[in-house]
A protein has these predicted regions:
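Hydrophobic residues within well-ordered alpha-helices
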Residues: 50, 75-80, 126, 168-173, ...
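A ligand-binding cleft/hinge motif common to bilobed small-molecule-binding domains
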Residues: 77-80, 85-98, 143-146, 173-211
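Extended ligand-binding regions for polar small-molecule ligands
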Residues: 41-54, 119-121, 127-139, 211-254
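Bilobed "Venus flytrap"/periplasmic-binding protein-like clamshell domains
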Residues: 36-53, 112-164, 185-186
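Ligand-binding clefts/hinges and TM-proximal coupling segments of bilobed small-molecule sensing domains
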Residues: 10-12, 139-160, 198-199, 234-258
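Extracytoplasmic small-molecule ligand-binding "clamshell" domains
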Residues: 10-89, 93-95, 249
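Periplasmic-binding protein-like
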Residues: 23-28, 107-114, 192-235, 250-258
Length: 258
């Protein structure tokens, strides 16, 4: 999950906020997962593993289906009312508001270049006459646009920004784009869910370097003790192979953050 406007967000208003204090049940860890996220099955397992590492009973709360309005308001409300921690957030500097903090990463994913062409092995093989795309606002697409701007006009591909990873993949499948740069976990999930994407494949980003991003969990900034313990638990699960086992068990395109 990524909300571009997070850095500008004021603490959201929640009606009767005074009713909600810190949960006093010291035997449970309530963790939220977003059913819209591509890593949902992985997040569920990692949340349970974190709870176990803390010797707590894990209580999963699935959110997102009936959300309306700004996600940032919903995140604040569920952290205030329901969950101690919310899994599935990219570790991007200077994005999150002061009232929110993020754990260390538990997996590292990559942005991938996807095409329907069976012959191309990398971006360098894509003819300059072809149109390439990327999901607008992502760090990988920003780097791609910066790279294209550094080239002479005659050496550039035409670049078309798209609203979402799913739209980008559909445009590749429909032949509107020769290739598209998307979040690897999104491609993993969407290819399983949509038969139109079965023929799509990943090619190398060369001449661009790999574009990776760590993913962790958010919680209220005031929960400093919990944050420290979550980081220790994640580090232990990364070190003992638990997270790697979860990722491999799902064939998920990511690696543990060491």
């Amino acid at each position: 999950m990524l909300i571009p406007a997070l850095a500008l967000a004021q603490t959201p208003y929640v009606q009767d906020e005074w009713k909600y204090g810190t949960r006093q049940d010291g035997t449970q860890l309530h963790y939220c997962v977003d059913e819209r996220d591509p890593d949902l099955p992985v997040a569920r397992k990692i949340g349970a593993a974190i709870a176990g590492a803390l010797l707590l009973e894990g209580k999963e709360h699935t959110v997102g289906e009936d959300w309306s309005g700004e996600d940032i308001d919903q995140i604040y409300q569920v952290l205030l009312e329901t969950c101690d921690v919310f899994l599935g957030f990219k570790l991007i500097a200077d994005v999150y508001p002061e009232w929110l903090t993020i754990t260390r990463g538990y997996y590292r994913g990559s942005y991938v270049l996807v095409t329907a062409n069976a012959d191309w092995k990398s971006l360098a093989d894509v003819p300059l006459s072809q149109v390439i795309g990327g999901t607008i606002g992502t760090s990988a697409d920003i780097r791609l646009m910066q790279y294209l701007e550094s080239l002479k006009p005659a050496e550039r591909w035409t670049h078309f920004p798209v609203a979402s990873d799913e739209t980008a993949l559909q445009d590749v499948a429909d032949g509107k784009l020769a290739a598209a740069l998307v979040w690897g976990p999104s491609f993993w999930a969407l290819q399983k869910a949509n038969a139109d994407f079965a023929k799509l494949r990943i090619i190398a980003l060369k001449p661009l370097p790999p574009s990776t991003m760590d993913v962790g969990a958010v919680l209220l900034a005031r929960e400093t003790f919990l944050r420290a313990n979550l980081d220790q638990a994640i580090a232990a699960l990364s070190g003992d192979g638990t997270i790697e086992g979860i990722l491999k068990g799902f064939g998920f395109p990511a690696t543990p953050v060491r």
